Amino acid sequence: MTTPKKEIDRTIYDLLGIGIGPFNLGLAALCEPINDLSCLFLDAKTEFDWHPGMLINSSRLQTPFMSDLVTMADPTSRFSYLNFAKQTSRLYSFYIRENFFLPRHEYNQYCQWVSKQLSNLNFGVKVTQVNYNAGEGIYAVTAIDRRSGKPLTYLCRKLVLGTGTTPYLPDNCPIQDPRVMHSASYMQQKTYLQSQSAITVIGSGQSAAEIFYDLLQDIDIYGYQLNWMTRSPRFYPLEYTKLTLEMTSPDYVDYFHELSSEKRHRLITEQKSLYKGINAELINDIYDLLYQKRLISNIQCQLLTNVALTAIDTSGDKLKLQFKHLEQDYALDQLTSAVVLGTGYQYHLPDFIQGIKSQIEFDDHGQLAIQRDYGIDVRGDIFIQNAGLHTHGISSPDLGMGCYRNATILQAVLGYAPYPIETRIAFQTFAPCNIADAKRQPLESNTHSAVTPSKTRQGLNPSAKSVQQPSIEPQTALRIAPTGGNVSALMAPNKEAQ
């Protein structure tokens, strides 16, 4: 058998992104008009498809449409959602609808629309290894073309890791049993689920709530028993008040990043309702639907809090879910035909990084030591997306802060800010020692400035000046990102409440 000849792209890219989710897709869109930056983004998938297993018809984003791929960095970009709506003849419908929150299906369509216009994306390419040539200061990214099987090599000076998160499964869950599934595959398994006599949803985050609501709508048609169980003491709503939303601002990121790792860990634990709760409107919709269903049918439905899943017995015709009640301290069993685990997602450093792992910095707890500018290595060459819950706080998975992070990364890569970066947008001050400075710096549009890196970093072109951009007024804080509890790197798994 002949081994395919390795194909080497001799271009030395200034920036190469691995993984094309919303955050790296947004970065690719922001890179497109920058003439002095050559970049390429790779993904093993054959096309962009955002959480296909959770594209439930009734689901919507928890962030406004302005948290698209580009608007918060460049409102004039042709890759904005508003331009997508115009180009697809739905702008007036969107205007009449008067709802800032997009259906998740539409957000996926928008991202696919952007991906098809960008020439710096390469889908169907699976990265297998990354090595560093210290003499030339170049990274060699080895990959496989999934269509042809041909080995590929790409060369670059800077890397951005955007490989995303994977479903988190508790140790006591036998996922090899087809009756046990994660919420990430819900839509693919929905037909199977609705053929069962009893379905149990575990978790109290947004994903679990959306699945329960979706299954509840047809409960009287299919006649199944539907259970919703969680270890949380109640079904917490997502905190959505405006002053709290300022905790997704650059101001709070500055404050949070300067805290000790112990204090940051404590705060993230305390702030779960700020990024793991359920949309309050959805909670109300669930209650109203329960009320309506019981008016017309004697449905079998159970909601139970304060119960921790301890084991799943798969030996019988039905699954036996074993729980412990956390307040009354007793054991209970629940028989079910199938179980959906809405237990969130966690980040794993990808295997292909082993060749350069010695360059990556970790803290005393073994977590990624992510710098303020999202760099993770000693030279400032490698950056990471959506893995900084433990270093940058609840803004890390926030779609609305994706543009801010990407603008910050581009500034670190280029040595200048191609897009204005807001540094002071919050009305509140998070650290008393900064009050005097806050008084001297008004909330005006002159608050754009460079993010100060935690280390000395050399950009590709530090002598260049910023690309001309229209003056932008300070942004308002945006909402927390949806679904699944996106997570930090190499820390305790960021799980949705179980």
From Swiss-Prot:
Domain of life: Bacteria
Ranges for region Disordered: 443-498
Keyword NADP: yes
Enzyme class: oxidoreductase
Pathway assigned in UniProt: Siderophore biosynthesis
The keyword Transferase belongs to this UniProt entry's keyword annotation: no
UniProt-annotated binding residues for FAD: F23, D43, K45, W50, H51, Q62, V127, N386, P397, L399
Alphabetized Gene3D superfamilies for the sequence: FAD/NAD(P)-binding domain
GO MF annotation terms: monooxygenase activity
Polar residues bias (residue ranges): 443-474
Signal peptide span: none
Alphabetical GO biological process terms: biosynthetic process
Pfam families reported in the protein's UniProt record: Lys_Orn_oxgnase
Enzyme Commission number(s) of this protein: 1.14.13.252
Binding site for NADP(+): Q62, R104, S207, R231, Y275, L309
Catalytic activity: putrescine + NADPH + O2 = N-hydroxyputrescine + NADP(+) + H2O
Record keywords: FAD, Flavoprotein, Monooxygenase, NADP, Oxidoreductase
Cofactor requirements of the protein: FAD
Record's function text: N-hydroxylating monooxygenase involved in the biosynthesis of the siderophore putrebactin. Catalyzes the N-hydroxylation of the aliphatic diamine putrescine into N-hydroxyputrescine (NHP).
Family label: Belongs to the lysine N(6)-hydroxylase/L-ornithine N(5)-oxygenase family.
Protein name: Putrescine N-hydroxylase
